[in-house]
C-alpha cells in the first residue's frame, strides 16, 4: 500500500481540493513561468499509471494481434499487470455439466491465456467474471455486449464455491503459490450496474464476494482478493463495512471512474468539475473512504479509467496532456491507475470496422501506434523521485544521477479552442548553461491519426501502410539545447506533451 500520509502539505491540499471540487475554473495562460529548484526535497514517485492496463476480454488474449500489442506496449512502459473480463465465459470453456448434471471443469484455455501473459512478462488481474450459463440461475440473463456474457448469479452457491476452489487450486498447482500470490483476484466487474443481475443488487453481490473470497482463501490464504470493482466509485463504504462486520477477507479495494462521467454520479455533487479532474477526484474520495473505514491499510486499485470518449478524443494528441494531468493529481492516491485499454483488440461493440474509431486502446486495429502510445513512452522516462511544484501543468522528477526529467503540457480549457502557449522553465540548483534534451507529442509530432488521414483513411490498412505510419510517427530524436542563464523557453503547441531532460 502507499504510505499515503507522508506526502507534502501541497499534495494533501491538492487531493482534498480535488475531492471537494475546489480545483475548477483554471484557465491556460498564453505565457507561463515554472520555477524549479533542483536541490529541493523529493518524495517517492512510483509509476502507478503505467504498471497495470485493461484489455479486451480473456479469450482475445490468445490472438497474435493482442500479444503483438502487449509486447509493443511493454517495450515502452513498465507494464506488469493486465486485467480483462470474462475468464469464466463459456467461450473459455471452464464450466460444463455432464449428462447427470454433475460439474465438469476444463482449464485448457485458462492455461493458454495465463501462460501467454506470463511468457510475455505480464501477470493477470484475475477478474472473476462472468457466469457460465450452466451454472447461472438465469441462463438467459445476457448482457447486450457483442459477446453476450451472462450476468446472472449462480443457481447454486455451493457449486460456485466448488468452482472457485477448483479454479484457484488449479492455478496454484500449475504456477505455484509464490507466483499466484503476486496476482490480484478481483470479484466481478461493475456489479452496481447492468453487469450483475442479482436482486437486491448490492446485497447479492456482497454475498457473492464473501463466498468467492472465502473459497479462494480456503485454497491458500496468500491469494489476494478484493473488490467491489464498481463503476463510478460506488459502494465503497458499504463494502468495507460489510467485510469488516462479517469477517470477510479483503486485500485491496478496487473501483472505476472515467473523466467523462457525470459529476453527480461519480462524486455526488453538483459542483462544476472539469472532465480532466474527475477521475482523480473520485479516487481521492475513495481513498478517504478507505482511510475512514475499519480497514484503512488497504491499497486502492483503480482498475478502469480513460480520457473522455467524445469526438474520438482517445485517438488524438489530446490524450497526452489529459494523461499527464491524471498522473500529477492521482499521485499519492492510488496504488495503480489502470488505463482501459492497452489495445484496440476489443469487441464489446463487435469487431472494429476500421482503425481510429475512438476506441480505448494505445494501439489501433492492425498494430498502429496511436499518439497515446507515444505519450506513455514519454512519461515512462520520468524519474521515481518527485520535486513538488506549484503549477498544475508540470511534473518535475529527479533521477539517481541528479539530472531532472520534467513533463510539461498544454491542456486546452474545456469548450475552448486549443492554442499554443509559451512556457519558461526557471531552474535553480544546476549550472546556468546545463545541457537539455527535448521530446514531444502534439498535433504535429507522433500524430498517427494525421498520418492515417494522409493515406486516405483506409478501412483495412495493408501491413506496409501500418509499418509506414509507425515509422513516420515514431518519437523523434531529442532536440538538444542548453539553458540560458538557468532558463529554458518553450512553445507548446495545442495538446502538447513535452519531456525535458536537464543534465547528463
At which residue positions do the language-model features occur?
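Non-catalytic accessory regions flanking glycosidase/transglycosidase catalytic cores in CAZymes
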Residues: 26-184, 203-232, 248, 292-297, ...
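C-terminal segment of classical bacterial N-terminal signal peptides
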Residues: 18-27
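Bacterial N-terminal signal peptides that target proteins for export
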Residues: 2-14
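Active-site-proximal loop/turn and secondary-structure-junction residues that shape catalytic pockets
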Residues: 88, 130-132, 189-193, 229-233, ...
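Noncatalytic carbohydrate-binding groove/subsite architecture in carbohydrate-active enzymes
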Residues: 201-335
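Short, conserved phosphate-binding/catalytic loop or strand-edge motifs used
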Residues: 183-190, 303
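Acidic carboxylate-rich catalytic motifs and surrounding loops in phosphoryl-/glycosyl-chemistry enzymes
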Residues: 339-345
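Short acidic/His/Gly/Ser-rich catalytic and metal-binding motifs that mark active-site loops
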Residues: 90-94, 133-143, 193-196, 260-266, ...
Amino acid at each position: 500500500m502507499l504510505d499515503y500520509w507522508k506526502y507534502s502539505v501541497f499534495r494533501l491540499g491538492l487531493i482534498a481540493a480535488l475531492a471537494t471540487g475546489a480545483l475548477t475554473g483554471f484557465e491556460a495562460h498564453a505565457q507561463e513561468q515554472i520555477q524549479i529548484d533542483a536541490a529541493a526535497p523529493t518524495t517517492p514517485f512510483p509509476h502507478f499509471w503505467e504498471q497495470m492496463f485493461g484489455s479486451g476480454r480473456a479469450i482475445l488474449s490468445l490472438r497474435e494481434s493482442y500479444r503483438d500489442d502487449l509486447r509493443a506496449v511493454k517495450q515502452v512502459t513498465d507494464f506488469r499487470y493486465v486485467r480483462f473480463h470474462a475468464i469464466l465465459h463459456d467461450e473459455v470453456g471452464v464450466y460444463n455439466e455432464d449428462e447427470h448434471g454433475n460439474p465438469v471443469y476444463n482449464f485448457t484455455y485458462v492455461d493458454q491465456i495465463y501462460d501467454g501473459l506470463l511468457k510475455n512478462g505480464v501477470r493477470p488481474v484475475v477478474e472473476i467474471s462472468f457466469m457460465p450459463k450452466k451454472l447461472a440461475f438465469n441462463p438467459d440473463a445476457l448482457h447486450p455486449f457483442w459477446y453476450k456474457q451472462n450476468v446472472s448469479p449462480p443457481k447454486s452457491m455451493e457449486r460456485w464455491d466448488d468452482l472457485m476452489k477448483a479454479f484457484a487450486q488449479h492455478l496454484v498447482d500449475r504456477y505455484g503459490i509464490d507466483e499466484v500470490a503476486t496476482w490480484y483476484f478481483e470479484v466481478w466487474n461493475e456489479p452496481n450496474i447492468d453487469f450483475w443481475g442479482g436482486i437486491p443488487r448490492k446485497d447479492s453481490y456482497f454475498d457473492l464476494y464473501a463466498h468467492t473470497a472465502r473459497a479462494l482463501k480456503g485454497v491458500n490464504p496468500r491469494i489476494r482478493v478484493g473488490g467491489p470493482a464498481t463503476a463510478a466509485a460506488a459502494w465503497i463504504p458499504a463494502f468495507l463495512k460489510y467485510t469488516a462486520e462479517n469477517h470477510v477477507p479483503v486485500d485491496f479495494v478496487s473501483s472505476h471512474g472515467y473523466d467523462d462521467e457525470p459529476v453527480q454520479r461519480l462524486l455526488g455533487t453538483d459542483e462544476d468539475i472539469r472532465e480532466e479532474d474527475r477521475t482523480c477526484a473520485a479516487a481521492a474520495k475513495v481513498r478517504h473512504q478507505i482511510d475512514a473505514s475499519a480497514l484503512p491499510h488497504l491499497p486502492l486499485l483503480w482498475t478502469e479509467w480513460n480520457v473522455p470518449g467524445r469526438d474520438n478524443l482517445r485517438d488524438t494528441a489530446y490524450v497526452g496532456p489529459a494523461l499527464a494531468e491524471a498522473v500529477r493529481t492521482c499521485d499519492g492516491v492510488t496504488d495503480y491507475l489502470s488505463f482501459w485499454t492497452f489495445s484496440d483488440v476489443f469487441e464489446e461493440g463487435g469487431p472494429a470496422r476500421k482503425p481510429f474509431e475512438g476506441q480505448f486502446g494505445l494501439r489501433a486495429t492492425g498494430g498502429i501506434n496511436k499518439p497515446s502510445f507515444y505519450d506513455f513512452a514519454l512519461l515512462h522516462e520520468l524519474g521515481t523521485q518527485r520535486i513538488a511544484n506549484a503549477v498544475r501543468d508540470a511534473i518535475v522528477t529527479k533521477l539517481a544521477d541528479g539530472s531532472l526529467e520534467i513533463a510539461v503540457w498544454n491542456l486546452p480549457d474545456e469548450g475552448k479552442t486549443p492554442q499554443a502557449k509559451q512556457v519558461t522553465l526557471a531552474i535553480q540548483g544546476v549550472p546556468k548553461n546545463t545541457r537539455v534534451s527535448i521530446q514531444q507529442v502534439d498535433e504535429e509530432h507522433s500524430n498517427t491519426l494525421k498520418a492515417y488521414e494522409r493515406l486516405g483513411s483506409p478501412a483495412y490498412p495493408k501491413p506496409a501502410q501500418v509499418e509506414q505510419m509507425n515509422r513516420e510517427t515514431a518519437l523523434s530524436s531529442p532536440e538538444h539545447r542548453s539553458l540560458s542563464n538557468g532558463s529554458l523557453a518553450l512553445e507548446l503547441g495545442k495538446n502538447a506533451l513535452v519531456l525535458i531532460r536537464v543534465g547528463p
